[in-house]
Amino acid sequence: MIKKRNTTKISVIGAGSVGATTAYALMLSGVATEIVLVDVNKSKTEGEAMDLSHGADFVKPVNILSGDYKDTEGSDIVVITAGAAQKVGETRLQLINKNINIFKSIIPEVVKYNKDAILLVVSNPVDVLSYVTYKLSGFPKERVIGSGTVLDTSRLKHEIGKRYKIDPRNVNTYIMGEHGDSEIATWSVTNIQNIKIDEYANKENLEYNDNFRKEVYENVKNAAYEVINRKGATFYAIALAVTRIVKAILGDEKTILPVSTLVENYYGIKDVYLGMPCIVGGSGIEKALSIDLNKTEASKLVKSAETLKNTLNNASGL
């Protein structure tokens, strides 16, 4: 449990597009009194910290600095965004071997100075690297969290909200499983302010059929690729997703977010990190919720878990 105190320290490992934008989003949110950026590119990291610090007059008091792992000591949360960038046409799972080796150098250093911190993994493939972090750190599963499908779920809500012309925040649904190509949309539990989506669509004379579900799902699943094809990387939305998770932890909100967690017995799935609805609070992941899926969704989730397990089994250096 993160103890109540006057200062809150967050360290961000990796000062690339995602890391720097995450630091910016955290700065704007006002959740931290100190943000530390660490990256192998010292000059760029110093520049990012300087640039952010120059906005001090426009936000709550916050000390932003660049440094080494020693400077992260005593962090409440360590956000890990470091890793090889996803290239055009490259799936998240193809990144694994490159990023495992990077994590082998990062995690021991993070743990050395932050034995009580919560680790929030953002680097892709996030589910696999969350599992790798869990194993390398020796931390309890509650304190090793992946950003999971929080962003994918936001994309799904956005797609439905756009088509139905309603506030996406009124759409209750989840993307579960891998943050990537085998993720699943939980249509069976999707509702609009507690009205089942099929009932809502019927009452409002809106489209809701196999074609609708397929089109929406494909748009969500391929969203990152579409952004990467146009601008080279995704970083704004994921930075907001990370900030949302951080706020849930620091505020001990006990809110439900589909983060990546160690699944131990859910539809027969064991010993793998997957995006699951979890209660997130001051202790990190306080509980993973075993929501009831229909047979098709459950089968797809099992396959998603198998995909990730196969990747782990085939990865070099594990």
UniProtKB/Swiss-Prot annotation:
Main localization of the protein described in the UniProt heading: cytoplasm
PROSITE patterns xrefs: L_LDH
Taxonomic lineage: Bacteria, Bacillati, Bacillota, Clostridia, Eubacteriales
Family in the record: Belongs to the LDH/MDH superfamily. LDH family.
A UniProt-annotated Pfam family: Ldh_1_N
Protein name per Swiss-Prot or TrEMBL: L-lactate dehydrogenase
Binding site residues for substrate: Q86, R92, N124, P125, V126, D127, D152, T153, S154, R155, T234
EC number: 1.1.1.27
